[in-house]
């Protein structure tokens, strides 16, 4: 297989990968994992111990809005229920150079994405009769300079019981402790069940073949480390899983919100849909907690709302970092991402880091590249003998195959030697592809000149054009043309086809491919010099 055919193989594999991936997004429906369908559609989950008599099923008026802020985000919490109804990520712009913080959680008429939590059950305060209307001493709370933690209590009293919903924000952290402290000064034992859920407007993914994105639910349980559960899945079958530990989340490109319940408790993961209001919820419900008269109890949970920062998420909850979804090539993508961040920490430029990763990958793959070109050179040396066999045996395909295999054995040539290195390189490319798509670190990351966002397409299409030109040059430097006229025409158009494909790809990925082609050209010349000394290659065609 000569290098032009190699390009054709790469193109076919790459296009097949893109088509398969888009098919997965559009048509693949996983088997439902629900074991029980909850038929109640409401703001809070139905009680496991009774009917829906204690469930709030109608929208309620808004309470006061309390602002909580640390150095990385600003939250707005409604005193009615203590729900987080708005969040702004202070370190991330909504648009490139907009100086406007990115809004993750929001509660608008046309788009709902909020984080709710409360207490239900026998003596719950989030019921059909209404939700807790908390009292807060102040309207705005901000983490002060030199302060590492900010705790803000929301207080509600009912029938001799004081409920404190305490939000704890930490410096530099996107996870919030949301704890219920219950002081039972009544004359009887009370029972409550904690819950946390994320409510989101039912939406469809807005990605495309070049940059697929996912907006929908996900969860982790004791049986499953990480699994997506899309809004379409929720409409078909409500999630219902009993687990110890685990979490529930809503994902979108680069960002995630997740509820992490008490990891030592037995929790129920669930989803609900409210088609009338075009809403879906994914959440957890904790076990019954009994608080005797005169006793105090604390029920703990955490909420993550922010970017997909793998290192931080891994410390917050087991497998939460898997929400950075590298697909089946994760075992290659993770070390590549580590290498990318390591190089960036040295060069302080993500574009240069991509070039550095490309250099390292091509250096590691150089033995395979050399083996590929050596195999192709040997195959070219055998072409006269193979042509003679074709003329001698004519239509006798079986005899011709036998003689060809005999010739390969005598000359110690592997006819697949040129294909194998390409097949081995494809998983690495796919892993890099997903790394560049999933890494929030590349969002709005500049390179040089006109490339100010490596996660977006080149605004002037310069990199795709250069990439196409490098493919064309690589083709022309191939030692022999493709003999078949049809293949020749296909190969002549291949750089143009790839260039058009890459017009809409993230510029970081195009930069990788461009640099990879340039390195391949340099390696090709180095390998050819060695083959010339062995008499396996001639620069004169």
UniProtKB/Swiss-Prot annotation:
GO terms for molecular function: membrane insertase activity. Pfam families: 60KD_IMP, YidC_periplas. Interacts with the Sec translocase complex via SecD. Specifically interacts with transmembrane segments of nascent integral membrane proteins during membrane integration. It is found in: Cell inner membrane. It comes from the Bacteria. It comes from Pasteurella multocida (strain Pm70). PANTHER family: CYTOCHROME C OXIDASE ASSEMBLY PROTEIN COX18, MITOCHONDRIAL, OXA1. One of its GO terms (cellular component) is plasma membrane. Disulfide bonds: none annotated. This is Membrane protein insertase YidC. NCBIfam families: PRK01318.1-1 (NF002351), PRK01318.1-3 (NF002352), yidC_nterm (TIGR03593), yidC_oxa1_cterm (TIGR03592). Required for the insertion and/or proper folding and/or complex formation of integral membrane proteins into the membrane. Involved in integration of membrane proteins that insert both dependently and independently of the Sec translocase complex, as well as at least some lipoproteins. Aids folding of multispanning membrane proteins. Belongs to the OXA1/ALB3/YidC family. Type 1 subfamily. The lineage of its organism: Bacteria, Pseudomonadati, Pseudomonadota, Gammaproteobacteria, Pasteurellales.
């Amino acid at each position: 297989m000569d290098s032009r055919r190699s390009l054709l193989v790469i193109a076919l594999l790459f296009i097949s990968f893109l088509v398969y991936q888009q098919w997965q997004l559009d048509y693949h429906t996983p088997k439902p994992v629900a074991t029980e369908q909850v038929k109640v559609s409401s703001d809070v989950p139905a009680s496991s111990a009774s009917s829906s008599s204690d469930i709030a099923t109608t929208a309620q008026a808004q309470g006061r809005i309390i602002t909580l802020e640390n150095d990385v985000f600003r939250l707005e919490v409604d005193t009615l229920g203590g729900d987080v109804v708005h969040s702004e990520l202070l370190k991330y712009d909504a648009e490139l150079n907009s100086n406007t913080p990115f809004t993750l959680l929001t509660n608008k008429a046309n788009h709902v994405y909020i984080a709710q939590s409360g207490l239900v059950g026998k003596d719950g305060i989030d019921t059909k009769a209404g939700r807790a209307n908390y009292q807060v001493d102040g309207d705005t709370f901000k983490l002060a300079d030199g302060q590492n933690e900010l705790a803000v209590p929301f207080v509600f009293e009912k029938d001799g019981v004081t409920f404190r919903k305490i939000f704890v924000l930490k410096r530099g952290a996107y996870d919030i402790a949301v704890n219920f402290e219950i002081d039972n000064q009544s004359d009887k034992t009370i029972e409550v069940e904690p819950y946390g859920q994320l409510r989101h407007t039912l939406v469809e993914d807005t990605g495309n073949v070049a940059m697929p994105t996912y907006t929908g639910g996900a969860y982790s349980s004791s049986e499953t480390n990480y699994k997506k559960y899309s809004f379409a899945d929720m409409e078909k079958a409500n999630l219902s899983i009993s687990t110890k530990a685990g979490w529930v989340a809503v994902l979108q490109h680069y960002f995630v919100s997740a509820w992490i319940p008490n990891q030592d408790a037995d929790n129920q993961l669930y989803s609900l849909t409210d088609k009338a209001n075009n809403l879906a919820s994914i959440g957890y419900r904790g076990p019954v907690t009994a608080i005797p008269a005169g006793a105090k109890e604390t029920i703990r949970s955490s909420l993550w709302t922010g970017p997909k920062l793998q290192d931080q998420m891994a410390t917050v909850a087991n497998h939460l970092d898997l929400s950075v979804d590298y697909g089946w090539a994760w075992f290659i993508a993770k070390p590549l991402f580590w290498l990318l961040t390591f190089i960036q920490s040295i060069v302080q430029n993500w574009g240069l880091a991509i070039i550095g990763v490309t250099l390292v990958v091509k250096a590691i793959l150089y033995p395979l590249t050399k083996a590929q070109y050596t195999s192709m050179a040997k195959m070219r040396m055998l072409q006269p003998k193979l042509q003679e066999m074709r003329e001698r045996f004519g239509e006798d395909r079986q005899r011709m195959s036998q003689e060809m295999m005999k010739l390969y054995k005598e000359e110690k040539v592997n006819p697949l030697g040129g294909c194998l290195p390409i097949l081995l390189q494809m998983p690495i490319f796919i892993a890099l592809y997903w790394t560049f798509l999933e890494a929030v670190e590349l969002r709005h990351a500049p390179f040089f000149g006109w490339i100010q966002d490596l996660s977006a397409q080149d605004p002037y299409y310069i990199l795709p054009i250069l990439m196409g030109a490098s493919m064309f040059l690589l083709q022309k430097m191939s030692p022999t043309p493709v003999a078949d006229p049809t293949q020749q025409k296909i190969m002549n158009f291949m750089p143009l086809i790839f260039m058009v494909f890459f017009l809409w790809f993230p510029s970081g990925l195009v930069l990788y491919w461009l640099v990879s082609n340039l390195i391949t050209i340099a390696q090709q010349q180095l390998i050819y010099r060695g083959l010339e000394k062995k008499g396996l290659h001639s620069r004169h065609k």
